[in-house]
């Protein structure tokens, strides 16, 4: 009972509303399987990597950058074999207003969404750019009295609480805080409040068509590669490799020794 009371006192004492410094870090939902950073999105090959379980993660830096990783699955009551899944990546700058409102301004050209509806898309997932400004009416951080960990509670624009997020990393685990996939003619972040498809430019349109043809499996195929980096090196096809040189040297030294002994 004393321990519970202590945690309760700590949570009340540690309750902070609207303090940007307390946002710093990587926060993850209860599943503890979704985290921002290179384990969720590969900006080089533009691959979204499917976590083991659904969840959401936010990261914040001291200089005003944020990153979001979301993996949501919604069931289909009429057909349980047809759940819809969505993977979303965004990053950009955040703004904290005087009234405690937190606004996330994503970089327009960097957001990505992979949407899968197996009973409607014939097994072909849709991969598009994504740009969604997010507004949180307020937030607070505190020590959870049950788990004893730092907790971030975000409140939606209407005041409804989101599921709590728990501190996973501090400093945060994030991709570089800069535009990752710049395009010609891009002018920075212009949030629209809704998801967007590829640019209307012909080259981007062609790229979008190609991406849409890829399956979910193809987009997440590098999951294990990214999580468990290999230390393998490229094998040389030349006969003059290290093993050849070593055995040749050994043979020559041995032959020379025999000649010296017999002479």
From Swiss-Prot:
Spans within the Lumenal topological domain: 22-241
GO biological process, one term: fungal-type cell wall biogenesis
Highest rank taxon of the organism: Eukaryota
Compartments it resides in: Endoplasmic reticulum membrane
Segments on the Cytoplasmic face: 263
Disulfide bonds: none
Record's function text: Required for normal levels of the cell wall 1,6-beta-glucan. Involved in a protein folding machinery chaperoning proteins acting in various physiological processes including cell wall synthesis and lysis of autophagic bodies.
Family to which the UniProt record says this protein belongs: Belongs to the ROT1 family.
Protein name (record): Protein ROT1
Organism name: Candida glabrata (strain ATCC 2001 / BCRC 20586 / JCM 3761 / NBRC 0622 / NRRL Y-65 / CBS 138) (Yeast)
